[in-house]
């Protein structure tokens, strides 16, 4: 006697889910002005989270730790000791 062994396979593949596949938008942090560059008062110099760079002369710190120029002048990035950096804005002398 002949025996038939029939097997049925799934005609549709099971659809799995993934926990990956998304990312947050970049926050565009970092330096916005270079050392030696001329800036006007209110210009954003550095966007950061926390105090990676500290405010120096004529530089203010916003609520989100953004550093901005308080006066017109030239940007200077400087070292404070071994492990700290600061950014300052020095006014340019006007020739009369």
Curated annotation (Swiss-Prot):
Which InterPro entries did the record assign? Ribosomal_bL27 (IPR001684), Ribosomal_bL27_CS (IPR018261)
Q: Which residues cross the membrane?
A: none
**Region annotation Disordered: where it falls in the sequence:** 14-35
Task: Write down any Gene Ontology CC term.
Answer: cytosolic large ribosomal subunit
Q: Which Gene3D superfamilies match?
A: 2.40.50.100
Q: Which UniProt keywords apply?
A: Ribonucleoprotein, Ribosomal protein
Q: Does the keyword Ribosomal protein apply?
A: yes
Q: Name one Pfam family in it.
A: Ribosomal_L27
Q: Name one GO molecular function term.
A: structural constituent of ribosome
Family indicated by similarity: Belongs to the bacterial ribosomal protein bL27 family.
Output this protein's name: Large ribosomal subunit protein bL27
Q: Which gene encodes it?
A: rpmA
